[in-house]
A protein has these predicted regions:
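Hydrophobic residues in well-ordered beta-strands that form the structural core
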Residues: 14-15, 40-42, 235
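Conserved N-terminal glycine/acidic-rich loop preference
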Residues: 9-15, 50-54, 201
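Aromatic-enriched alpha-helical interface/lid elements that frame and gate functional surfaces
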Residues: 153-233
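Active-site-adjacent "lid/gating" segments in soluble enzymes
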Residues: 22-165, 169-170
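Beta-rich nucleic-acid/ligand-interaction surfaces
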Residues: 123, 202, 241-243
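Conserved PLP-binding catalytic core of the aspartate aminotransferase-like
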Residues: 208, 235-243
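Residue-level detector of anion-binding/catalytic polar loops
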Residues: 11-12, 37, 112, 232
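A structured beta-alpha segment of the ubiquitous adenosine-cofactor-binding alpha/beta core
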Residues: 1-33, 215
Length: 243
């Protein structure tokens, strides 16, 4: 049955441990003998070759080795896993794009690709900023929670009700001025918040001011009010709220 499927298919995708397909008699040479035009995509934890190829891998391993968890967490806190194990879906999405590209390339060139997708590399594609920061400065970036390295405010703030939150972010002085006018009529002219550098320097105080304003308001009310004046804000949605 498998040979019949391979003979009439465009792509074979496997997510076995390294060497399993060959042990089953369906390594790339055997697959190509059945169908010379078959595209083969092999998904693994650490790639099909190299010193780590045979290591065990689950989703958290990809985030650890790629540096994602080292960049995740609050100031002064430990490295933290993300809310979902991004390595699993991330590897699948990376493979899907690679297969689509391979199909297009085969149409143009007649060459069938063999694709090697590792979970570590898939996760690493999401960690560009910390890597570049290290290359530029020689220092490991500090964990900053929900904050941004440059912009403030940039945080998830408490709203009224149980476990309700709303994200608010400003990346220009104009956006800040509009937000500040809503928070306090005198705040737009406050010297300690006038520029992006000022706001970042006084971020802790700024977060306290915004939290004091949001905590007594419905998270949707906050989002709609701020979106109406061109400030990026949206409630943090739980699975229950989404359903």
């Amino acid at each position: 049955i498998i040979e019949q499927l391979v003979g009439t298919s465009d792509v074979v995708i496997d997510n076995f441990g390294v060497g399993t397909m060959a042990d089953l008699g369906f390594g790339i040479e055997e697959l190509r003998a059945i169908n010379p035009d078959i595209i083969v995509a092999s998904l693994s934890g650490y790639g099909q070759t190299g010193p780590s190829a045979w290591y065990m891998a689950y989703g958290p391993a990809g985030g650890s080795l790629a540096g994602l968890y080292a960049a995740t967490g609050y100031e002064g806190g430990p490295a933290t896993e993300t809310g979902i194990s991004i390595g699993d879906p991330g590897t699948g999405m990376t493979a899907a794009w690679a297969v689509a590209a391979a199909l297009a390339a085969r149409t143009r060139t007649g060459i069938a690709a063999a694709i090697d997708v590792s979970m570590v590399e898939a996760v690493a594609s999401t960690v560009g900023e910390p890597w570049m920061a290290y290359l530029a400065t020689g220092d490991n970036p500090e964990r900053i929670g929900n904050h941004d390295p440059v912009w403030a405010p940039h945080e998830c703030y408490p709203a009224s009700g149980r476990d309700n939150w709303v994200t608010i972010a400003c990346t220009t002085d104009d956006e800040w001025q509009r937000l500040a006018a809503v928070l306090d009529p005198e705040l737009p002219n406050a010297p300690r918040f006038l520029t992006a550098v000022d706001r970042k320097r006084n971020e802790f105080e700024l977060d306290q001011i915004i939290s004091a304003w949001t905590c007594g308001r419905d998270h949707w009310e906050v989002a709609r009010q701020l979106q109406a004046i061109g400030v990026a804000a949206f409630p943090s949605q739980s699975p229950q709220a989404l359903w």
